[in-house]
Amino acid sequence: MQCLLRALGATPALVLAMSASAQTADKASLYPAAAAGDGATTGGYNLSRWAEDWRALCDPAKRTDPIDALKCVKLTPSGDVYVTFSGEARLRVNHTTNPNLRDSPAQRQDIVRLVGGADVHVGEHLRVYAEVAHGGISGRELGAPAATLRNDIAVQQLFVEAKGRVGAVDVGARYGRQEFVDGPNLMVSQRDNNTIRYTVNGLRAWARTETMRVDAFDLKPTQYGDLGTEDDVIDPARRFSGVTLGFVVPKGWFGGAKLYVDPFFWRRRNKVGAWGGRVGPATRYYLGTHVFGEAGRVTIDWTVNHQWGTFRDQKIDAWHLLFAQNVRLGTSAAAPRLGFHADYASGGGGYGDGKLRNAYAPFGNNIYYSYGLFLTPSNLITVAPTFSVSPTPRLRLSAAVQRAWRANVHDAVYRASGAPFAGTQNVRDARIGDVLQLQAIWTLSPRLSVTGRYEHLAAGPSLTRAGYTSSDFLAGWISFRF
Protein backbone atom coordinates (compact mmCIF):
# COMPACT_ATOMS: atom_id res chain seq x y z
CA MET A 1 0.00 0.00 0.00
CA GLN A 2 2.87 2.42 0.79
CA CYS A 3 4.41 1.88 -2.68
CA LEU A 4 1.04 2.66 -4.24
CA LEU A 5 0.83 5.94 -2.31
CA ARG A 6 4.40 6.85 -3.28
CA ALA A 7 3.56 6.18 -6.92
CA LEU A 8 0.47 8.37 -6.73
CA GLY A 9 2.58 11.12 -5.20
CA ALA A 10 4.79 11.15 -8.29
CA THR A 11 1.96 12.13 -10.64
CA PRO A 12 1.23 15.85 -9.99
CA ALA A 13 3.58 16.98 -12.79
CA LEU A 14 1.74 14.79 -15.29
CA VAL A 15 -1.62 16.10 -14.08
CA LEU A 16 -0.59 19.76 -14.22
CA ALA A 17 0.95 19.40 -17.67
CA MET A 18 -2.17 17.80 -19.10
CA SER A 19 -4.50 20.31 -17.47
CA ALA A 20 -2.45 23.25 -18.76
CA SER A 21 -2.42 22.05 -22.37
CA ALA A 22 -6.07 20.97 -22.55
CA GLN A 23 -8.96 23.20 -23.40
CA THR A 24 -12.03 23.15 -21.21
CA ALA A 25 -13.71 19.83 -21.98
CA ASP A 26 -17.37 19.58 -22.84
CA LYS A 27 -19.33 17.56 -20.32
CA ALA A 28 -20.10 14.84 -22.86
CA SER A 29 -17.21 12.71 -24.11
CA LEU A 30 -16.67 12.52 -27.85
CA TYR A 31 -16.41 8.73 -28.22
CA PRO A 32 -19.57 6.74 -27.28
CA ALA A 33 -19.33 6.00 -23.56
CA ALA A 34 -20.80 2.51 -23.99
CA ALA A 35 -17.78 1.50 -26.11
CA ALA A 36 -14.99 3.40 -24.36
CA GLY A 37 -13.74 0.39 -22.40
CA ASP A 38 -15.21 1.34 -19.01
CA GLY A 39 -18.02 -1.23 -18.83
CA ALA A 40 -21.77 -0.89 -19.23
CA THR A 41 -23.83 1.74 -17.41
CA THR A 42 -27.49 0.84 -16.77
CA GLY A 43 -29.89 3.15 -14.98
CA GLY A 44 -26.97 5.38 -14.05
CA TYR A 45 -25.04 2.55 -12.35
CA ASN A 46 -21.84 0.82 -13.46
CA LEU A 47 -19.85 -2.00 -11.83
CA SER A 48 -16.90 0.42 -11.85
CA ARG A 49 -18.43 3.23 -9.83
CA TRP A 50 -16.04 5.88 -11.16
CA ALA A 51 -17.56 5.34 -14.64
CA GLU A 52 -20.89 6.78 -13.45
CA ASP A 53 -21.89 10.38 -14.16
CA TRP A 54 -24.06 12.04 -11.52
CA ARG A 55 -23.45 15.70 -12.42
CA ALA A 56 -27.16 16.24 -13.07
CA LEU A 57 -27.78 15.77 -9.33
CA CYS A 58 -25.68 18.83 -8.56
CA ASP A 59 -28.98 20.61 -9.23
CA PRO A 60 -31.08 20.10 -6.05
CA ALA A 61 -34.28 20.34 -8.11
CA LYS A 62 -33.40 17.06 -9.84
CA ARG A 63 -32.96 15.06 -6.63
CA THR A 64 -35.76 12.73 -5.58
CA ASP A 65 -34.56 11.49 -2.17
CA PRO A 66 -31.90 12.26 0.49
CA ILE A 67 -29.41 9.76 -0.97
CA ASP A 68 -29.29 11.75 -4.21
CA ALA A 69 -27.58 14.55 -2.27
CA LEU A 70 -24.56 12.25 -1.72
CA LYS A 71 -23.94 12.19 -5.46
CA CYS A 72 -22.84 15.83 -5.54
CA VAL A 73 -21.47 17.30 -2.33
CA LYS A 74 -20.05 20.69 -3.29
CA LEU A 75 -16.73 21.60 -1.66
CA THR A 76 -16.57 25.13 -3.11
CA PRO A 77 -19.33 27.72 -3.54
CA SER A 78 -19.08 27.51 -7.33
CA GLY A 79 -19.42 23.73 -7.30
CA ASP A 80 -16.30 23.25 -9.45
CA VAL A 81 -14.90 21.04 -6.72
CA TYR A 82 -17.28 18.36 -5.51
CA VAL A 83 -17.31 14.77 -4.31
CA THR A 84 -19.56 11.89 -5.33
CA PHE A 85 -20.02 9.20 -2.69
CA SER A 86 -20.93 5.61 -3.55
CA GLY A 87 -21.45 2.39 -1.65
CA GLU A 88 -22.62 -1.19 -1.81
CA ALA A 89 -23.75 -3.84 0.65
CA ARG A 90 -24.15 -7.36 -0.73
CA LEU A 91 -25.32 -10.36 1.29
CA ARG A 92 -24.94 -13.71 -0.46
CA VAL A 93 -25.29 -17.43 0.18
CA ASN A 94 -23.69 -20.10 -2.06
CA HIS A 95 -24.46 -23.81 -1.75
CA THR A 96 -22.31 -26.22 -3.79
CA THR A 97 -22.64 -30.00 -3.75
CA ASN A 98 -19.54 -32.10 -4.39
CA PRO A 99 -17.14 -29.15 -4.26
CA ASN A 100 -14.14 -29.60 -6.55
CA LEU A 101 -16.32 -32.23 -8.32
CA ARG A 102 -15.34 -34.83 -5.73
CA ASP A 103 -17.90 -36.95 -3.84
CA SER A 104 -17.79 -34.94 -0.61
CA PRO A 105 -20.02 -32.96 1.81
CA ALA A 106 -21.67 -29.86 0.39
CA GLN A 107 -20.10 -26.46 0.88
CA ARG A 108 -22.04 -23.43 2.11
CA GLN A 109 -20.61 -19.94 1.87
CA ASP A 110 -22.27 -17.04 3.72
CA ILE A 111 -20.66 -13.97 2.18
CA VAL A 112 -20.74 -10.26 3.03
CA ARG A 113 -19.40 -7.48 0.83
CA LEU A 114 -19.23 -3.85 2.00
CA VAL A 115 -17.80 -1.15 -0.28
CA GLY A 116 -17.49 2.61 0.09
CA GLY A 117 -16.13 5.04 -2.49
CA ALA A 118 -15.44 8.75 -2.92
CA ASP A 119 -14.88 10.43 -6.29
CA VAL A 120 -13.39 13.91 -5.83
CA HIS A 121 -13.66 16.15 -8.90
CA VAL A 122 -11.44 19.24 -9.10
CA GLY A 123 -12.82 21.17 -12.04
CA GLU A 124 -13.23 19.51 -15.42
CA HIS A 125 -9.69 18.16 -15.67
CA LEU A 126 -8.73 16.42 -12.44
CA ARG A 127 -10.23 13.77 -10.21
CA VAL A 128 -9.10 11.45 -7.41
CA TYR A 129 -11.02 8.25 -6.72
CA ALA A 130 -10.71 6.10 -3.59
CA GLU A 131 -12.60 2.93 -2.70
CA VAL A 132 -12.32 0.64 0.31
CA ALA A 133 -13.90 -2.80 0.67
CA HIS A 134 -14.53 -5.47 3.29
CA GLY A 135 -15.15 -9.13 2.60
CA GLY A 136 -16.48 -11.58 5.18
CA ILE A 137 -17.25 -15.28 4.87
CA SER A 138 -18.53 -18.07 7.10
CA GLY A 139 -20.33 -21.35 6.51
CA ARG A 140 -19.42 -25.02 6.14
CA GLU A 141 -16.65 -26.93 4.38
CA LEU A 142 -14.94 -23.66 3.56
CA GLY A 143 -11.38 -24.89 3.38
CA ALA A 144 -9.00 -21.91 3.26
CA PRO A 145 -10.93 -18.98 1.72
CA ALA A 146 -8.96 -16.79 -0.66
CA ALA A 147 -8.20 -13.18 0.24
CA THR A 148 -10.74 -12.13 -2.39
CA LEU A 149 -13.44 -13.75 -0.22
CA ARG A 150 -12.14 -12.94 3.28
CA ASN A 151 -10.47 -9.58 3.80
CA ASP A 152 -10.79 -7.33 6.84
CA ILE A 153 -10.30 -4.20 4.77
CA ALA A 154 -8.70 -3.46 1.43
CA VAL A 155 -8.02 -0.32 -0.55
CA GLN A 156 -9.74 -1.72 -3.60
CA GLN A 157 -9.10 1.31 -5.82
CA LEU A 158 -7.08 4.51 -5.47
CA PHE A 159 -6.12 6.56 -8.50
CA VAL A 160 -5.68 10.05 -9.88
CA GLU A 161 -7.01 10.97 -13.32
CA ALA A 162 -6.37 13.94 -15.58
CA LYS A 163 -8.29 14.61 -18.77
CA GLY A 164 -9.13 17.34 -21.22
CA ARG A 165 -9.83 18.18 -24.82
CA VAL A 166 -7.08 19.14 -27.26
CA GLY A 167 -8.67 20.34 -30.47
CA ALA A 168 -11.18 17.64 -31.44
CA VAL A 169 -9.56 14.91 -29.34
CA ASP A 170 -10.35 13.85 -25.77
CA VAL A 171 -7.12 12.89 -23.99
CA GLY A 172 -6.64 11.48 -20.53
CA ALA A 173 -4.54 9.39 -18.18
CA ARG A 174 -5.34 7.42 -15.04
CA TYR A 175 -2.63 6.29 -12.62
CA GLY A 176 -2.91 4.09 -9.55
CA ARG A 177 -4.97 1.11 -8.43
CA GLN A 178 -7.99 0.64 -10.69
CA GLU A 179 -10.37 -1.78 -12.34
CA PHE A 180 -9.58 -2.49 -15.99
CA VAL A 181 -12.21 -3.85 -18.37
CA ASP A 182 -11.09 -2.48 -21.74
CA GLY A 183 -11.53 -5.65 -23.76
CA PRO A 184 -13.77 -8.69 -24.20
CA ASN A 185 -15.39 -9.73 -20.92
CA LEU A 186 -13.97 -13.25 -21.25
CA MET A 187 -10.47 -11.75 -21.47
CA VAL A 188 -10.46 -8.91 -18.92
CA SER A 189 -12.96 -8.36 -16.09
CA GLN A 190 -13.16 -6.94 -12.57
CA ARG A 191 -14.71 -10.29 -11.54
CA ASP A 192 -17.73 -9.06 -9.63
CA ASN A 193 -18.34 -12.62 -8.45
CA ASN A 194 -15.43 -12.15 -6.04
CA THR A 195 -16.17 -10.29 -2.83
CA ILE A 196 -13.02 -8.21 -3.32
CA ARG A 197 -12.83 -7.44 -7.01
CA TYR A 198 -9.86 -7.88 -9.34
CA THR A 199 -7.79 -4.70 -9.64
CA VAL A 200 -4.54 -3.66 -11.27
CA ASN A 201 -1.94 -0.97 -10.62
CA GLY A 202 -0.27 1.36 -13.08
CA LEU A 203 -1.04 3.67 -15.97
CA ARG A 204 -3.85 3.80 -18.52
CA ALA A 205 -3.88 6.62 -21.09
CA TRP A 206 -6.20 7.38 -23.99
CA ALA A 207 -6.99 9.63 -26.93
CA ARG A 208 -10.52 9.60 -28.39
CA THR A 209 -12.38 11.31 -31.19
CA GLU A 210 -16.03 10.87 -32.16
CA THR A 211 -15.33 7.77 -34.26
CA MET A 212 -12.04 6.26 -33.06
CA ARG A 213 -9.94 5.81 -29.97
CA VAL A 214 -6.59 4.47 -28.80
CA ASP A 215 -5.98 3.25 -25.24
CA ALA A 216 -2.54 2.22 -23.94
CA PHE A 217 -1.79 0.65 -20.57
CA ASP A 218 0.94 -0.82 -18.39
CA LEU A 219 -0.43 -2.59 -15.31
CA LYS A 220 0.43 -5.02 -12.52
CA PRO A 221 -2.25 -6.93 -10.56
CA THR A 222 -3.00 -6.44 -6.89
CA GLN A 223 -1.88 -9.29 -4.64
CA TYR A 224 -4.34 -9.24 -1.75
CA GLY A 225 -3.68 -10.34 1.79
CA ASP A 226 -6.59 -11.06 4.14
CA LEU A 227 -5.88 -8.61 6.97
CA GLY A 228 -5.52 -4.83 6.71
CA THR A 229 -4.40 -2.57 3.90
CA GLU A 230 -0.67 -3.16 4.40
CA ASP A 231 -0.75 -6.72 3.03
CA ASP A 232 -2.48 -5.73 -0.23
CA VAL A 233 0.56 -5.22 -2.45
CA ILE A 234 1.42 -4.84 -6.11
CA ASP A 235 2.23 -8.28 -7.56
CA PRO A 236 5.92 -8.19 -8.60
CA ALA A 237 5.69 -11.35 -10.73
CA ARG A 238 3.01 -10.38 -13.26
CA ARG A 239 2.68 -7.51 -15.72
CA PHE A 240 0.03 -6.74 -18.34
CA SER A 241 0.53 -4.08 -21.01
CA GLY A 242 -0.70 -3.24 -24.46
CA VAL A 243 -2.74 -1.10 -26.82
CA THR A 244 -6.44 -1.29 -27.72
CA LEU A 245 -7.93 0.61 -30.64
CA GLY A 246 -11.60 1.37 -31.16
CA PHE A 247 -13.64 2.28 -34.23
CA VAL A 248 -17.31 3.21 -34.56
CA VAL A 249 -18.84 1.40 -37.53
CA PRO A 250 -20.69 3.99 -39.66
CA LYS A 251 -24.41 3.66 -38.93
CA GLY A 252 -25.30 3.74 -42.60
CA TRP A 253 -23.44 0.50 -43.27
CA PHE A 254 -25.98 -1.66 -41.44
CA GLY A 255 -29.15 0.40 -41.34
CA GLY A 256 -28.50 2.45 -38.21
CA ALA A 257 -26.63 -0.25 -36.27
CA LYS A 258 -24.54 0.62 -33.21
CA LEU A 259 -21.48 -1.55 -33.84
CA TYR A 260 -17.88 -1.18 -32.69
CA VAL A 261 -14.62 -2.82 -33.76
CA ASP A 262 -11.74 -2.97 -31.24
CA PRO A 263 -8.43 -4.43 -32.48
CA PHE A 264 -5.94 -5.09 -29.67
CA PHE A 265 -2.30 -6.03 -29.12
CA TRP A 266 -1.41 -7.06 -25.57
CA ARG A 267 1.47 -8.64 -23.69
CA ARG A 268 1.28 -10.56 -20.41
CA ARG A 269 4.43 -11.49 -18.50
CA ASN A 270 4.42 -13.93 -15.60
CA LYS A 271 7.58 -14.98 -13.78
CA VAL A 272 5.77 -17.89 -12.10
CA GLY A 273 3.62 -19.32 -14.90
CA ALA A 274 2.37 -22.88 -14.33
CA TRP A 275 1.30 -25.63 -16.72
CA GLY A 276 1.18 -29.36 -16.05
CA GLY A 277 2.99 -29.11 -12.72
CA ARG A 278 5.82 -27.10 -14.29
CA VAL A 279 6.56 -23.55 -13.07
CA GLY A 280 8.60 -20.98 -14.94
CA PRO A 281 8.65 -17.61 -16.70
CA ALA A 282 6.05 -16.98 -19.40
CA THR A 283 5.57 -14.20 -21.92
CA ARG A 284 2.36 -14.32 -23.92
CA TYR A 285 1.32 -11.94 -26.71
CA TYR A 286 -2.27 -11.37 -27.85
CA LEU A 287 -3.30 -10.03 -31.25
CA GLY A 288 -7.02 -9.95 -31.89
CA THR A 289 -10.23 -8.09 -32.60
CA HIS A 290 -13.39 -7.57 -30.57
CA VAL A 291 -16.60 -6.76 -32.50
CA PHE A 292 -19.69 -5.90 -30.47
CA GLY A 293 -22.92 -3.91 -30.42
CA GLU A 294 -26.42 -3.97 -31.88
CA ALA A 295 -27.75 -4.23 -35.42
CA GLY A 296 -31.51 -3.89 -35.33
CA ARG A 297 -32.84 -6.62 -33.05
CA VAL A 298 -29.55 -8.55 -33.06
CA THR A 299 -26.87 -8.13 -30.37
CA ILE A 300 -23.40 -9.56 -30.95
CA ASP A 301 -20.17 -9.95 -28.97
CA TRP A 302 -17.45 -11.62 -31.04
CA THR A 303 -13.75 -12.04 -30.30
CA VAL A 304 -10.94 -13.66 -32.27
CA ASN A 305 -7.36 -13.59 -31.00
CA HIS A 306 -4.09 -15.40 -31.61
CA GLN A 307 -1.61 -15.92 -28.78
CA TRP A 308 2.10 -16.62 -29.04
CA GLY A 309 5.25 -16.35 -26.96
CA THR A 310 7.18 -18.69 -24.66
CA PHE A 311 6.67 -20.64 -21.44
CA ARG A 312 10.04 -21.77 -20.09
CA ASP A 313 11.59 -23.31 -23.23
CA GLN A 314 8.21 -24.10 -24.84
CA LYS A 315 6.75 -21.98 -27.64
CA ILE A 316 3.15 -20.78 -27.31
CA ASP A 317 0.71 -21.02 -30.23
CA ALA A 318 -2.94 -20.65 -29.15
CA TRP A 319 -6.31 -19.28 -30.27
CA HIS A 320 -9.54 -17.92 -28.82
CA LEU A 321 -12.69 -17.85 -30.99
CA LEU A 322 -15.53 -16.50 -28.83
CA PHE A 323 -18.96 -15.78 -30.32
CA ALA A 324 -22.08 -14.70 -28.41
CA GLN A 325 -25.24 -13.43 -30.11
CA ASN A 326 -28.96 -13.09 -29.54
CA VAL A 327 -32.01 -11.67 -31.26
CA ARG A 328 -34.86 -9.70 -29.68
CA LEU A 329 -38.16 -11.42 -30.46
CA GLY A 330 -40.21 -8.26 -30.67
CA THR A 331 -39.99 -4.52 -31.14
CA SER A 332 -39.90 -3.42 -27.49
CA ALA A 333 -36.70 -3.33 -25.46
CA ALA A 334 -38.31 -5.75 -22.96
CA ALA A 335 -39.09 -8.41 -25.57
CA PRO A 336 -37.70 -11.94 -25.03
CA ARG A 337 -34.25 -12.70 -26.43
CA LEU A 338 -33.16 -15.96 -28.03
CA GLY A 339 -29.54 -16.67 -28.82
CA PHE A 340 -26.50 -18.86 -28.32
CA HIS A 341 -22.81 -18.69 -27.63
CA ALA A 342 -20.23 -20.88 -29.35
CA ASP A 343 -16.65 -20.74 -28.12
CA TYR A 344 -13.33 -22.38 -28.98
CA ALA A 345 -10.25 -22.14 -26.77
CA SER A 346 -7.34 -24.18 -28.09
CA GLY A 347 -5.53 -26.74 -25.95
CA GLY A 348 -2.60 -29.09 -25.98
CA GLY A 349 0.97 -29.10 -24.75
CA GLY A 350 0.07 -28.26 -21.16
CA TYR A 351 2.14 -31.20 -19.98
CA GLY A 352 5.21 -30.37 -22.07
CA ASP A 353 4.57 -32.07 -25.41
CA GLY A 354 5.38 -29.87 -28.42
CA LYS A 355 4.07 -26.31 -28.50
CA LEU A 356 1.93 -24.96 -25.68
CA ARG A 357 -1.41 -24.55 -27.44
CA ASN A 358 -3.49 -23.77 -24.35
CA ALA A 359 -5.32 -20.48 -24.76
CA TYR A 360 -5.24 -18.28 -21.68
CA ALA A 361 -7.29 -15.22 -20.67
CA PRO A 362 -5.34 -12.59 -18.67
CA PHE A 363 -8.10 -12.10 -16.05
CA GLY A 364 -11.42 -12.81 -17.69
CA ASN A 365 -14.92 -13.35 -16.34
CA ASN A 366 -14.48 -16.48 -14.20
CA ILE A 367 -18.19 -17.45 -13.95
CA TYR A 368 -19.33 -17.24 -17.58
CA TYR A 369 -19.15 -21.01 -18.09
CA SER A 370 -19.76 -22.11 -14.50
CA TYR A 371 -20.61 -20.29 -11.26
CA GLY A 372 -19.07 -23.31 -9.55
CA LEU A 373 -15.78 -22.22 -11.17
CA PHE A 374 -15.37 -25.58 -12.91
CA LEU A 375 -14.59 -24.36 -16.46
CA THR A 376 -12.43 -21.74 -18.16
CA PRO A 377 -11.60 -20.86 -21.80
CA SER A 378 -8.54 -23.08 -22.09
CA ASN A 379 -8.71 -26.41 -23.95
CA LEU A 380 -12.46 -25.87 -24.20
CA ILE A 381 -15.22 -26.00 -26.81
CA THR A 382 -18.73 -24.95 -25.77
CA VAL A 383 -22.09 -24.45 -27.44
CA ALA A 384 -25.01 -23.06 -25.45
CA PRO A 385 -28.47 -21.90 -26.58
CA THR A 386 -29.67 -19.00 -24.41
CA PHE A 387 -33.05 -17.44 -23.63
CA SER A 388 -34.10 -14.47 -21.52
CA VAL A 389 -37.44 -12.82 -20.84
CA SER A 390 -38.91 -10.11 -18.61
CA PRO A 391 -42.44 -11.14 -17.60
CA THR A 392 -42.67 -7.89 -15.64
CA PRO A 393 -40.62 -4.68 -15.94
CA ARG A 394 -38.71 -5.53 -12.75
CA LEU A 395 -38.12 -9.26 -13.24
CA ARG A 396 -35.60 -10.77 -15.63
CA LEU A 397 -35.41 -14.54 -16.19
CA SER A 398 -32.65 -16.25 -18.16
CA ALA A 399 -31.69 -19.82 -19.04
CA ALA A 400 -28.93 -21.63 -20.92
CA VAL A 401 -27.99 -25.23 -21.62
CA GLN A 402 -24.28 -25.55 -22.28
CA ARG A 403 -22.45 -28.52 -23.79
CA ALA A 404 -18.70 -28.66 -23.27
CA TRP A 405 -15.83 -30.65 -24.79
CA ARG A 406 -12.06 -30.57 -24.68
CA ALA A 407 -10.34 -29.17 -27.76
CA ASN A 408 -7.44 -31.62 -27.24
CA VAL A 409 -7.94 -34.97 -25.47
CA HIS A 410 -4.24 -35.19 -24.58
CA ASP A 411 -4.58 -32.20 -22.28
CA ALA A 412 -6.57 -31.58 -19.10
CA VAL A 413 -9.89 -29.99 -18.22
CA TYR A 414 -9.09 -26.65 -16.57
CA ARG A 415 -10.86 -24.84 -13.73
CA ALA A 416 -11.61 -21.11 -13.62
CA SER A 417 -8.41 -20.64 -11.60
CA GLY A 418 -6.39 -22.10 -14.48
CA ALA A 419 -5.50 -25.21 -12.47
CA PRO A 420 -6.14 -28.59 -14.14
CA PHE A 421 -8.46 -31.30 -12.88
CA ALA A 422 -5.66 -33.74 -12.14
CA GLY A 423 -5.82 -36.95 -14.14
CA THR A 424 -8.12 -35.68 -16.88
CA GLN A 425 -5.11 -35.36 -19.19
CA ASN A 426 -4.95 -39.18 -19.22
CA VAL A 427 -8.57 -39.64 -20.38
CA ARG A 428 -9.11 -39.86 -24.14
CA ASP A 429 -12.78 -38.86 -24.30
CA ALA A 430 -13.47 -35.27 -25.38
CA ARG A 431 -16.83 -34.77 -23.64
CA ILE A 432 -16.56 -32.69 -20.45
CA GLY A 433 -20.26 -32.49 -19.64
CA ASP A 434 -23.37 -30.32 -19.72
CA VAL A 435 -24.24 -27.27 -17.62
CA LEU A 436 -27.83 -26.15 -17.02
CA GLN A 437 -27.99 -22.48 -15.99
CA LEU A 438 -31.07 -20.68 -14.59
CA GLN A 439 -31.19 -17.17 -13.16
CA ALA A 440 -33.77 -14.66 -11.92
CA ILE A 441 -33.07 -10.99 -11.15
CA TRP A 442 -35.73 -8.98 -9.34
CA THR A 443 -34.94 -5.26 -9.47
CA LEU A 444 -36.98 -3.70 -6.70
CA SER A 445 -35.47 -0.28 -7.45
CA PRO A 446 -32.39 1.02 -9.28
CA ARG A 447 -30.53 0.65 -5.97
CA LEU A 448 -31.92 -2.64 -4.65
CA SER A 449 -31.96 -6.03 -6.39
CA VAL A 450 -32.37 -9.70 -5.49
CA THR A 451 -30.77 -12.47 -7.58
CA GLY A 452 -31.25 -16.23 -7.56
CA ARG A 453 -29.03 -18.64 -9.52
CA TYR A 454 -29.11 -22.41 -10.06
CA GLU A 455 -26.70 -24.54 -12.05
CA HIS A 456 -26.30 -28.26 -12.54
CA LEU A 457 -23.09 -29.62 -14.01
CA ALA A 458 -23.64 -33.13 -15.36
CA ALA A 459 -20.13 -34.53 -15.55
CA GLY A 460 -19.17 -36.28 -18.78
CA PRO A 461 -16.54 -38.98 -19.36
CA SER A 462 -13.59 -36.55 -19.43
CA LEU A 463 -14.35 -35.97 -15.75
CA THR A 464 -15.99 -39.18 -14.52
CA ARG A 465 -13.24 -41.43 -15.88
CA ALA A 466 -10.74 -39.41 -13.85
CA GLY A 467 -12.75 -39.83 -10.63
CA TYR A 468 -14.82 -36.64 -10.70
CA THR A 469 -18.59 -36.33 -10.38
CA SER A 470 -21.53 -34.00 -11.02
CA SER A 471 -22.38 -30.93 -8.94
CA ASP A 472 -25.24 -28.56 -8.15
CA PHE A 473 -24.78 -24.87 -7.44
CA LEU A 474 -27.49 -22.76 -5.79
CA ALA A 475 -27.02 -19.13 -4.78
CA GLY A 476 -29.02 -16.11 -3.72
CA TRP A 477 -27.93 -12.59 -2.99
CA ILE A 478 -29.35 -9.18 -2.25
CA SER A 479 -27.48 -6.06 -3.26
CA PHE A 480 -28.02 -2.47 -2.18
CA ARG A 481 -25.99 0.28 -3.81
CA PHE A 482 -26.11 4.04 -3.97
List PLM regions with ranges:
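Membrane-embedded beta-strand positions of outer-membrane beta-barrel proteins
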Residues: 85-87, 130, 173-175, 205, ...
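Residues on the lipid-exposed face of transmembrane beta-strands in outer-membrane beta-barrel proteins
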Residues: 87, 114-120, 157-162, 203-207, ...
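N-terminal periplasmic/intermembrane-space "pro-region" immediately following the signal or transit peptide
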Residues: 2-5, 14, 20-106, 123, ...
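Surface-exposed loop and membrane-interface regions of Gram-negative outer-membrane beta-barrel proteins
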Residues: 58, 95-112, 121-168, 186-189, ...
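Outer-membrane beta-barrel pore domains and translocons
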Residues: 88-92, 133-135, 176-180, 219-221, ...
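Signature for the C-terminal beta-barrel architecture of outer-membrane proteins
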Residues: 166-171, 187-352, 410, 423-427, ...
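Extracellular/periplasmic loop regions
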Residues: 36-54, 60-64, 277, 303, ...
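Predominantly the C-terminal beta-signal and adjacent terminal strand-loop region
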Residues: 444-477, 481
